Curated annotation (Swiss-Prot):
Glycans are attached at residues 72, 241, 321. It comes from Rotavirus A (isolate RVA/Cow/Germany/993/1983/G18P[17]). GO terms for molecular function: metal ion binding. Ca(2+) 2 binds at residues 180, 231-232, 234, 304. Disulfide bonds join 85-138, 168-252, 194-247, 199-210. Gene3D superfamilies: Glycoprotein VP7, domain 1 (3.40.50.11130), Rotavirus outer-layer protein VP7, domain 2 (2.60.120.800). Homotrimer; disulfide-linked. 2 Ca(2+) ions bound at each subunit interface in the trimer hold the trimer together. Interacts with the intermediate capsid protein VP6. Interacts with the outer capsid protein VP5*. It is found in: Virion; Host endoplasmic reticulum lumen. This is Outer capsid glycoprotein VP7. GO terms for cellular component: host cell endoplasmic reticulum lumen; T=13 icosahedral viral capsid; viral outer capsid.
Amino acid sequence: MYSTECTILLIEIIFYFFAAVVVYDAIHKMANSPIFCIAVLAVVFAVSPKCFAQNYGINVPITGSLDVAVPNKTDDQIGLTSSLCIYYPNEAEIEINDNEWKNTVAQLLLTKGWPTTSVYLNGYADLQSFSNNPQLNCDYNIVLVKYDQNAGLDMSELAELLLYEWLCNEMDVNLYYYQQTSEANKWIAMGSDCTIKVCPLNTQTLGIGCQTTDVATFEQLTATEKLAIIDVVDGVNHKVNYTIATCTLKNCIRLNQRENVAIIQVGGPEIIDVSEDPMIVPKMIRATRINWKKWWQVFYTVVDYINTIIQAMSKRSRSLNTSTYFLRI
């Protein structure tokens, strides 16, 4: 069997042989016929300008990806074609105590290019209930979280929960052992009182440093928490124990970033820096902090910097809620 290079060489030899025969025959005819000679010269003069013309892409080499970002040159305002949801704790509405306060905020956002019909202000009772069913359905979603050092809910874990999409399934710890298979595989516990204990198992399903029949020997990972994202050693089976009546535990895979969600911490000595959590890959900047004074001051600050915040986000590509992508069963 001939190689590709050999085949190409044979084709070139045959081509040049026939070309030489044609040229020889043409020269012979031109010598005997002035009319044929004039016709050949006319064809050569007609074709030559095309041969030396500018090449606009026939042989342009492709050296990289064609999937490049094309900047938007229209400079359209985002607010004219997008919806904006701002989520706030109900205590803000109680403190403001003004029936028209939402309309006021909407009118102020109008000065920043957001039509009043595109802005939605949604309150939530507490972070526990909100984290269980966030309903982040706008093109851009901003969550205001008031700092509370006494809260059982870990706000950095709430940030990880909201800033990523998760694919989850319920865990039946009475029937099965569970293991985490990768860095993106976590267990998410939610409820009013989540105390999680585990017993790692060896290949013979015997406890490592614990007894599978004695919960008192299990390692305790959380204590009376409302939300916990649990990380254990990958590739090791675990027997899990928790109070089913006050907590739900789900086996989850962290998927893509929710780039249309941003979290603003209100008050507190330091910012929720979810990017510093070793569980978070890749790093992100959609979590920030503003000083706490009064809730009116908070909303004024949000309005003033709304477009700066939006620039760190991306418009949603699908609806995000518990029934679709947040905690999909």
